[in-house]
Design a protein with these regions (language model features):
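N-terminal leader segment of winged-helix/HTH proteins
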Residues: 12, 16, 20, 24, ...
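Terminal interaction helix/tail motif
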Residues: 56-59, 85, 91, 214-273, ...
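C-terminal peripheral helix-coil segments that are non-catalytic and often amphipathic
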Residues: 2-110, 268-271
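N-terminal helix-turn-helix DNA-binding core of bacterial DNA-binding proteins
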Residues: 132-176, 187, 302-345
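Basic/polar phosphate-binding segments, predominantly the helix-turn-helix DNA-binding elements
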Residues: 132, 180, 349
Length: 435
């Protein structure tokens, strides 16, 4: 779904402005209006070329011809009176290419120490902080695992729902939802008339849901500190765009996983997408964490399938190998801090990678004194992992213009900062309770 605000002069298409109004300086808006006019068979703005020349310079004529070819070709292929939602999304991809041509090119590898931007890793790090602080906070009321709590919240917010709808909304498979439903039934927090009937909260579930919801609202206010309502709404709009593409990635990987093994291994990390998605996943805009969890869930599920298909490694094994390969050799303390997991889980995974001949170590005996680096085969898989991660992140963020992407990441950085502060406070409270 396209949620683009009406650009300057955009009211003209609705008959609310005259065609003689001056064209705004936003070249993307100018080209969007030009494409919409071509689709609708309306006169194009004669000032468009001049406005584009002021901002795009020598690329102005090329940009007009590219957009005209796209708009007229899409109209012939579709035949509808009004452009469909995917028309605007694909046009944004075309404009992103023009914008990239305007930017100064970077040659050579990224500077030393600069990690490639991979949104899955960024999401995981932030959500881990939110989850840990949430476990500490909600456990003081009643301990529930995160998925159980999310289902409780959803039933409290939306009323009775069948498990399939819950599974789609929270972004986890039906088997996990079934296990969670079983636990909540045993706790008598939810009920249903028969196996396929909608789930609903019991009186105890309503009471607990109300108490936990008050805590969730307080935590949400903390996580959205210094984020205005307008900024938050744009953040949610962007998440909806990203979620549509994350679901498309997941559907691609599911199809590949069900195909012949030879065909699976020969497929690229990301295939072309025709812009058509299945049922739209409706996000919960009442709290900032829920949409991020759903986005992360779909992106992680497709990532697990992709990395398994391309490397034979689990998602976490690929993560560990990636961290070891970024700036080898890596000492143990640095590795554990980057992974943000406990020593035992990190140790088991590193040991497994060493047994498979993908990681080697140097230094004194003992895990804590070692320095780890990828073997020759590990280095090859490291490149595969990073190229797949780069392509997946590029695919996910492709519909976003440079300024929209910058605003999204700036808001995301505020959430990261607030999540860190929230976790520090909850850890301090837990320490006081223990003493």
């Amino acid at each position: 779904m396209e949620n683009r605000p009406v650009p300057p002069g955009g009211a003209k298409q609705a008959g609310k402005a005259s065609g003689r109004e001056p064209v705004g300086t936003d070249w993307r808006a100018v080209l969007h209006r030009h494409a919409d006019a071509l689709w609708g068979g309306e006169p194009t703005d004669p000032e468009a070329a001049a406005a584009l020349a002021r901002t795009l310079g020598p690329l102005a004529d090329d940009a007009l011809h590219i957009v005209e070819a796209y708009a007229l070709g899409a109209k012939r292929a579709n035949g509808a009176a009004a452009p469909p939602a995917e028309f605007g999304v694909r046009l944004d991809l075309v404009l992103n290419g023009i914008e990239a041509a305007l930017a100064p090119s970077e040659s050579g590898p990224p500077p030393a120490g600069r990690r490639p931007h991979m949104i899955q890793s960024e999401l995981w790090q932030v959500l881990r902080k939110v989850r840990e602080s949430g476990e500490l906070s909600y456990a003081r009321e009643q301990y529930l695992i995160e998925l159980d709590r999310r289902i409780l919240f959803r039933l409290y917010d939306r009323g009775p729902q069948v498990p399939a709808d819950v599974s789609s909304a929270v972004g986890v498979d039906k088997a996990q939802v079934s296990r969670s439903v079983k636990r909540l039934l045993e706790l008598r927090l939810i009920e249903r008339e028969q196996i396929r009937a909608p789930l609903r909260l019991t009186r105890d579930g309503e009471r607990l849901g109300k108490r936990l919801m008050r805590m969730a609202d307080l935590r949400n206010r903390e996580l959205t500190l210094d984020i205005s309502d307008a900024e938050l709404n744009e953040f949610f709009d962007t998440i909806e765009v990203l979620l549509e593409r994350a679901v498309a990635l997941y559907e691609q990987e599911r199809e590949l996983a069900q195909g012949p093994e030879g065909a699976r291994n020969g497929e690229p990390p990301v295939k072309d997408w025709d812009g058509k998605a299945g049922d739209k996943v409706v996000i919960d805009r009442s709290r900032i964490v829920a949409p991020l969890l759903t986005l992360s869930a779909y992106f992680s599920r497709s990532g697990s399938l992709a990395f398994k298909r391309l490397t034979g490694l689990s998602s976490f094994e690929a993560f560990v190998l990636s961290e070891i390969g970024i700036d080898p050799p890596t000492d143990w303390a640095t590795l554990v801090k980057a992974l943000a997991r406990d020593h035992s889980q990190a140790g088991r995974t590193v040991t497994a990678l060493m047994k498979r001949g993908l990681v080697e170590r140097e230094g004194k005996p003992g895990r804590r004194h070692g320095r780890f680096f990828p073997s020759e085969e590990g280095a090859r898989l490291f490149e595969v992992i990073h190229e797949a991660g780069r392509q997946r992140s590029t695919f996910l963020l492709a519909p976003l213009a440079a300024d929209q992407r910058a605003r999204f990441l700036a808001t995301f950085e505020k959430v990261r900062r607030n999540a860190t502060s929230q976790l520090d406070r909850e850890r301090a409270i837990a320490e006081i309770d223990r003493s």
